[in-house]
């Protein structure tokens, strides 16, 4: 929920497109995350669901959604649990996904991190959870020990250097970026083709209506719409449905 097609590269593309539409410098660092998936997730549950009525979630739940990633510190203990759980989840699950895909094996993971975290995903999750429970009880806040946090961040840095920033996914990023820009530019100039449910809010901000629409697409759906809009077809109607 809230995540753009193609992950964080789609998020960056929408931030760039919105900045340009508003006459702002897209290369200014403060405009890099005009569109942020965690804020979009909160927007969905507060304003977009149920025809604009929202889901009537508690402050703690929305706090966890809004602050689950990035540098925002959650106001509530529940929100801080979500944030630290998110980091545990993507580090451990991305390792599992990479191993299943044959992109890395356990022995290539940083030794110093494995010595603290453990040598398998179940072991790593168990050790981190126990560490959080113990340290949180000790300090009266939701927290890992410094040694466990450093080990987790070492593993995260390894994944960024050897998985996220290399390989097929990285090669495809420029194409995904351009695709999102193209979709935004098309629909912001053809608002009549944006589905009605996305036009019930922000009447004076068509860029937000379009961002709501595009960010809710799956990778496959975004690609299919792009093909319909930009690639020639022999006779026939567009495949996508408004």
Regions found by a protein language model. Give the residues of each.
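Histidine-centered, transition-metal-coordinating active-site segments
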Residues: 22, 34-242
């Amino acid at each position: 929920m809230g995540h753009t097609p193609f992950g964080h590269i789609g998020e960056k593309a929408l931030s760039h497109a919105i900045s340009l539409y508003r006459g702002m410098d897209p290369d200014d660092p403060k405009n890099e995350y005009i569109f942020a998936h965690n804020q979009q997730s909160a927007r969905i549950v507060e304003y977009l669901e149920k025809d604009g009525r929202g889901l009537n979630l508690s402050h703690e739940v929305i706090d966890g959604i809004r602050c689950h990633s990035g540098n925002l510190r959650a106001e509530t203990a529940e929100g801080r649990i979500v944030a630290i759980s998110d980091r545990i989840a993507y580090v451990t699950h991305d390792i599992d996904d990479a191993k299943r895909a044959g992109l890395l094996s356990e022995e290539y993971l940083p030794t110093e991190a494995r010595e603290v975290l453990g040598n398998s995903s179940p072991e790593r999750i168990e050790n981190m959870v126990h560490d959080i429970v113990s340290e949180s009880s000790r300090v009266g806040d939701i927290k890992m020990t410094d040694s466990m946090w450093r080990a987790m961040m070492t593993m995260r840095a390894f994944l960024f250097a050897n998985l996220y920033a290399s390989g097929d996914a990285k090669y495809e990023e420029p194409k995904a970026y351009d695709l999102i820009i193209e979709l935004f530019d098309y629909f912001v100039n053809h608002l009549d083709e944006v589905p009605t449910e996305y036009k019930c809010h922000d009447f004076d901000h068509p860029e937000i209506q379009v961002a709501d629409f595009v960010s809710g697409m799956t990778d496959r759906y975004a690609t299919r719409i792009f093909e319909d809009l930009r690639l020639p077809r022999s006779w026939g109607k567009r495949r996508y449905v408004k």
